[in-house]
Amino acid sequence: QPQWKLFLKWGWLSFAVFVLMAPVFYTMYISFNELGFGAKYYIFTFQWYENVFSDKQLINALGWTMLLALITLPIVIPFGLLSAKLYKQSTQKVWIVFVLLSPLFVPADILGSALLVFFKNLNKFFTFISEHTGIYMFETWFDLGIMSAVIGLIVYTLPYVFVVIMITMARYRPEQPEAARDLGASAWRAFWEIEFPQIRAGVFSACAFVVILTFNEYTRTSLLKGGFDTFTSVLISQMLN
């Protein structure tokens, strides 16, 4: 490929990324302005960052949000990967896409409320079982808290993980791991050494998506989180007050 074509391609890609990221760069720029957003003059300061890192409530909420992301990641990524593999091998692709993407078409408040009612009724059921059997193992499993918030995040993020990995899987041919199996490789080795290197970018992109969506999520998590605050909920409450 001619050098000028390669230079033109990377130049265009860099320009597109710059245009997409320009609002983020501008926000970072004004975050160091002592006079705040929209001011006529610019005075450099770290004041706003000092305020953020000295806010114990905000830092605590940041920790809870990171915990939610770290718990959700190792659950939703394998589910998304297996769903994408099922889509790749199945002849009923339309139904798989319909089922996996259906949470995206349900408004956040309706989906969050439905999950809230579901967990409340499920908790009542296990409480009833506990009272009549004396087995209290599952009594508090579905109280509002970390577990309910994580389940809500899994329902919300799984469609995105599925789509990202599915698009990446379009690049490789399923005959390759099958050939490795025929040559004596185990299923895990065929996946890890042949399939995963080709879809690695999609898996890592899906991980980044999950973390970003966890920080961005407000409505569903607010209904399901129970007694702790997330980063977004604290930010919104501080802005409203």
Residue spans of the language-model regions?
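Membrane-interfacial helix termini and adjacent extracytoplasmic/periplasmic loops
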Residues: F46, D109-V155, W188, T221, ...
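Periplasmic/extracellular loop-to-transmembrane helix junction in inner-membrane transport proteins
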Residues: K5, F32-T72, L240-N241
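Transmembrane-helix boundary motif in ABC transporter permease subunits
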Residues: Q1, K5-L6, L70-L101, S113, ...
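Transmembrane alpha-helices
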Residues: G11-M21, S102, V155, V161-M166, ...
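Membrane-embedded alpha-helices of multi-pass transport/permease systems
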Residues: M21-F25, Y29-F32, P78-L82, S148-I151, ...
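Interhelical loop and adjacent transmembrane-helix boundary motif
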Residues: P2-Q3, G36, Y49-Q57, F215-N241
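Hydrophobic positions within alpha-helical transmembrane segments of bacterial inner-membrane proteins
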Residues: A22-V24, A69, L73-K85, D109, ...
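Hydrophobic alpha-helical elements at and bordering transmembrane segments
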Residues: G11, M28, L58-L62, M66, ...
